[in-house]
From Swiss-Prot:
Protein known as: Large ribosomal subunit protein uL18
GO cellular component term, pick one: cytosolic large ribosomal subunit
Family: Belongs to the universal ribosomal protein uL18 family.
GO molecular function term, any single one: 5S rRNA binding
Natural source organism: Anaplasma marginale (strain Florida)
Protein origin, superkingdom: Bacteria
Amino acid sequence: MEPAMSLCDLKRATRRKRRVRLKLRSLSSVRLSVFKSNRHFYAQLIDDEKGATLAAASTLEPDVLATAKRRVNSEAARVVARLFAGRLDGLDANYRKFVLDRGSCRYIGVVAAFADELRSLGFEF
């Protein structure tokens, strides 16, 4: 069993999330929000003007569950990125450009693998 986050770590993560969201507020109305837990990875495209989620994908999808056995890894994040790109292509509006809202997650490992895969599929952020 992994130890819970300390109070100092939680405060640091909260500050990081606020700092990132404050910078993103002025950039675009459409943002790609990602969240990583120890077992799963989630991504959703959010339109802040409408207050609606346009598309979402995660490792909880049946297609991805086989790749992510017990913990989230870079390969599972790449599969989620391909699934997410397919869902974005299915939308009637052309969402090829948005900003990445990494929240309290640092841009390394799984988040970087997800972003690199989306960039290789032709998305800009």
